[in-house]
Amino acid sequence: MSATDFDSLYQLIFNAGLVICFGLGVISGGQR
């Protein structure tokens, strides 16, 4: 696995984490 593959994979995971955190925040905020 090359450094570029690892970098793009890390970026994908990081972006997914941001989306999930943001989504959970919106969902929990809307339930209040």
Swiss-Prot record:
Primary subcellular site in the record, as a coarse category: virion
Taxonomy, superkingdom: Viruses
Pfam families per record: Inovirus_G7P_2
Keyword terms of this UniProt record: Host membrane, Membrane, Transmembrane, Transmembrane helix, Virion
InterPro entries: Inovirus_G7P_2
Membrane topology: Single-pass membrane protein
Entry GO CC: host cell membrane; membrane; virion component
Listed transmembrane segments: 9-29
Cellular compartments annotated: Virion; Host membrane
Stated family: Belongs to the inovirus G7P protein family.
Its job: May initiate with G9P the virion concomitant assembly-budding process, by interacting with the packaging signal of the viral genome. The assembly-budding takes place at the host inner membrane. In turn, G7P and G9P are present at the end of the filamentous virion that emerges first from the bacterial host.
Protein name: Tail virion protein G7P
Organism: Escherichia phage If1
Lineage of the species this protein comes from: Viruses, Monodnaviria, Loebvirae, Hofneiviricota, Faserviricetes
